[in-house]
Amino acid sequence: MIAIVDDDDLMRSALQGMLKAVGLPAQAFASAEEFLKSGQQRQAGCLIADIRMPGMSGLQLQAQLNAEHCRIPIIFITAHGDEKMRMQALRAGAVEFMAKPFNDEALLESVRAALES
């Protein structure tokens, strides 16, 4: 299962639809806190997360998962990223960092690579 964590309803819906259209099961969460409360951390084969969200950010979510020794491949997506943020995310263990709007095929390729890792 691919977990999607994004505070934007339209983005969550679009990502979930895109993944399901190619046969990849996905579950969407409106916040990092909702994802953590769901208990789905260990079932997720990959996590697509926005970096900037109200409450816990994507980077804080990544730190929490690392603290729990939960090594989910994380693909960050953001409309507000810069090179400094990209490097911070990659140093913390993200497998990909994509700026919105992103190419759907590039995202799917990153998801497939993350699932195979």
Positions of the model-derived regions?
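Active-site beta3 strand of CheY-like receiver
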Residues: 42-48
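Active-site residues of response regulator receiver
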Residues: 50, 78
